[in-house]
From Swiss-Prot:
This protein is one of the early assembly proteins of the 50S ribosomal subunit, although it is not seen to bind rRNA by itself. It is important during the early stages of 50S assembly. This is Large ribosomal subunit protein uL13. InterPro entries: Ribosomal_uL13, Ribosomal_uL13_bac-type, Ribosomal_uL13_sf. One of its GO terms (molecular function) is mRNA binding. One of its GO terms (biological process) is translation. Keywords: Ribonucleoprotein, Ribosomal protein. Gene3D superfamilies: Ribosomal protein L13 (3.90.1180.10). Belongs to the universal ribosomal protein uL13 family. It holds the Pfam family Ribosomal_L13. It comes from Albidiferax ferrireducens (strain ATCC BAA-621 / DSM 15236 / T118). Part of the 50S ribosomal subunit.
Amino acid sequence: MTKTFSAKAADVVHEWFVIDATDKVLGRVASEVALRLRGKHKAIYTPHVDTGDFIVIINAAQLRVTGAKSTDKIYYSHSGYPGGISSVNFRDMQAKFPGRALEKAVKGMLPKGPLGYAMIKKLKVYGGAEHPHTAQQPKVLEL
């Protein structure tokens, strides 16, 4: 009788990939990145083990959204004080913090809890074309 394979955390090899987000649609990039951060693209995927890879995203400032979402997509945050809600649309967020919209989109697609928090730490987003992870020799991933 064969037994179901269950990956061990010590046996998992985390690879490094780099994605160029120039003129890519936000949601399509985010869904592919979330899938790879979880490790669901691997045959050894195990739900309770972090089997995902490291993802480096460059040129996040050139991400685009479809339709009128650049002005209509609103991100809300609250300070915790009465009347402390603040909102910013996609265009303004990209201008001030390039890549934060992508981080928020991916974070919403990952599981909530200790394992999900460990997965989001493997995502590195940079607004420009330069990144400090060349020593890890990331492979180029085309979407």
